[in-house]
Structure formats: C-alpha cells, structure tokens
Amino acid sequence: MNSDRIIKKYPNRRLYDTEVSRYITLADVRNLVMDCTSFKVVDTANESDITRSILLQIMLEEETGGEPLFSASMLAQIIRFYGGTLQGMFARYLESSLDLFAKQQQDMTKTLGDNPFEAMTRMTQKNVEIWADMQEEF
C-alpha cells in the first residue's frame, strides 16, 4: 500500500490535497516538507508524477525570497554535472551528504536541546567549576 499523501495538480495550476479535501498553496506544500510528510504530486492531465517539479518551484521561491542557500557559482557547478559521466555519482553523493548532515544536525539538537547556546553555556560553567575545584585541591 502506498502511504504517500496525494496532491493533485489541475490544469488551472491549482493544487488539491486529497487527504484534507481542499485546495492548497505552495506554502502549504512547503509546510508538508518541513513536517517531513511524505507526499506525491500528480498532474491530473496525464497522471505523471511532478513532485520534483513542485519541489523545485518551492526552492526557487525560497532562493529569490530571502537568504539564498546556493551561490551562483555553486549552481553553475551543479549544472555542469548534468549529462556528464559523473551525474549519477554526484547525485548520490549530494543525497548521502545531505542525509548525513541532517542526521548530525538532529543528533546535535537532541544532545544540546533547542537552545545550543544555553547548553554550551552550561557546559562552560561546568568546566569552570571543575577547574576551580581542581585548583582548590592543589
């Protein structure tokens, strides 16, 4: 059984979330991504999977709306991999690197809590206490 949430894209460019039975925006789709909700976007005209296309639209909005994640140089380098002999390897490398980075970020958040500065401050204070105790012993 496929557990992906189905979002239908109609010829009028509107997106319809079949799980909540209402039209949604790209911002709503972005929220699904941020909530790690698995979904698939299907073009109703030909039943093709257009999930990647919708995700790229969201990335484009993010890149033009605020602090860009990708520099022009980085984008140019990525484009150069298209059609090359290393395209598949590069795609797997990027995906593996992002997976590792996300796991490390999750582990760090779990270890340090929601406020890493507070955790670092506590750690520093504890180290100062240990040093003070050691100095008193000598």
Curated annotation (Swiss-Prot):
GO terms classed as biological process: regulation of DNA-templated transcription
Xref: InterPro entries: PHA_DNA-bd_N, PHA_reg_PhaR, PHB_accumulat
Pfam families per the UniProt record, alphabetical: PHB_acc (PF05233), PHB_acc_N (PF07879)
Transmembrane segments: none
Protein name, per record: Uncharacterized protein in phbA 5'region
